[in-house]
Amino acid sequence: VPPVVSERGASRHLGNGAREQVTYTADPRVDAYIGVLPDWQQAICREVRDLVHAADREVEETIKRRDRPYFVLQGNVCALLAAKDHVNVFLYDGGIVADPEGIITGGHDNKTARTVAIRREETINAAALLAMFKQIIANNRAGGWRKLKAARP
């Protein structure tokens, strides 16, 4: 039985300083995951959730690995995992998406995903994370990071 979904909103930067309101379908299982976290982790998760939906209206939410929120569009885009003192954002990019802002904090040698760990009181580099989400989605639409990586010389 598919979960009952609700509509949520996020805003998307249009590049000229303007913002566009984006409506997305929220999975209540993701709401439940976020809802039991401490307030500071809830705020981080909600901001990341809004960013990934702002990257592309077609991103869908689901739960994988029993209870972990995943955001998918023609493949995994990212996942959330709250830890004791931070929230991990797993970026499923195969290590091929550029990180000019240096937001990647772990998994540099991982063949599947890298991590952005966001700690309490830290400000999310929303522009950098949004750019990475957009590139991961573009890569997914082009056949996925595995195909793109294999095509490299």
Question: Where do the model's predicted regions map?
Answer:
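Charge-dense, helix-prone N-terminal extensions
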Residues: P2-P153
